[in-house]
């Protein structure tokens, strides 16, 4: 690596450690020519899959677009920006884990809906109303009923069984 101070090519690594939950390496370096020290950060360059839109067109993945959609759905809900950013990172990991170079916008929408369902049910309904193109109030009611059944089903499973004494 070239020294940022004197442009010499010989530098040595003094210290290396993982940062950002193991997603980056922080290296402390020293130039062998001018003896200046500086810090570098290294991270893997991960390529996100392209998105295949409903009309068949393709576009590069746009993290800002996904973040704004999540933020819009979660507007005025008790979810912190940190939780939203964690959700975005989880979604990006899920997209990369498919191993595909391209994924459909439907698949991405399904991943987003699953993430919103975990974060906030009201935000999930907001997003679903647009994503699933609800036509009337009965479709809202059906989705709310489905959410209620899922919640009740999980609650029943979570309760420990009573034992006789």
UniProtKB/Swiss-Prot annotation:
Source organism's superkingdom? Bacteria
- Presence of keyword Protein transport: no
Tell me the Gene Ontology biological-process terms attached to this UniProt entry: negative regulation of DNA-templated transcription
The record, for HAMAP family, names: NrdR (MF_00440)
Where's the ATP-cone domain?
A: 49-139
Q: Which GO terms describe its molecular function?
A: ATP binding; DNA binding; zinc ion binding
- Zn finger (unnamed) location: 3-34
Q: Which family does it belong to?
A: Belongs to the NrdR family.
Q: Where is the signal peptide?
A: none
Pfam families assigned: ATP-cone (PF03477), Zn_ribbon_NrdR (PF22811)
What functional role does this protein have? Negatively regulates transcription of bacterial ribonucleotide reductase nrd genes and operons by binding to NrdR-boxes.
Keywords from the named record = ATP-binding, DNA-binding, Metal-binding, Nucleotide-binding, Repressor, Transcription, Transcription regulation, Zinc, Zinc-finger
**Protein's name according to its UniProt entry:** Transcriptional repressor NrdR
Origin species: Colwellia psychrerythraea (strain 34H / ATCC BAA-681) (Vibrio psychroerythus)
What does the record say about how the cofactor binds? Binds 1 zinc ion.
Q: Which cofactor does it need?
A: Zn(2+)
């Amino acid at each position: 690596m070239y020294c940022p101070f004197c442009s010499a090519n010989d530098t040595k690594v003094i210290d290396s450690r993982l940062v950002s939950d193991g997603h980056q390496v922080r290296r402390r370096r020293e130039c062998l020519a001018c003896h200046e020290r500086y810090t570098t950060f290294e991270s893997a360059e991960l390529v996100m899959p392209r998105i295949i839109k409903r009309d068949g067109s393709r576009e590069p993945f746009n993290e800002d677009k996904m973040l704004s959609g999540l933020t819009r759905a979660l507007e005025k809900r008790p979810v912190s920006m940190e939780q939203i950013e964690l959700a975005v990172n989880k979604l990006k990991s899920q997209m990369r884990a498919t191993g595909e170079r391209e994924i459909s916008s439907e698949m991405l929408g399904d991943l987003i809906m699953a993430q919103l369902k975990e974060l906030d049910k009201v935000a999930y309904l907001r997003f679903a109303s647009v994503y699933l193109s609800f036509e009337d109030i009965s479709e809202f009611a059906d989705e709310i009923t489905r959410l209620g059944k899922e919640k009740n089903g999980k609650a029943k499973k979570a309760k420990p069984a009573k034992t006789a004494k």
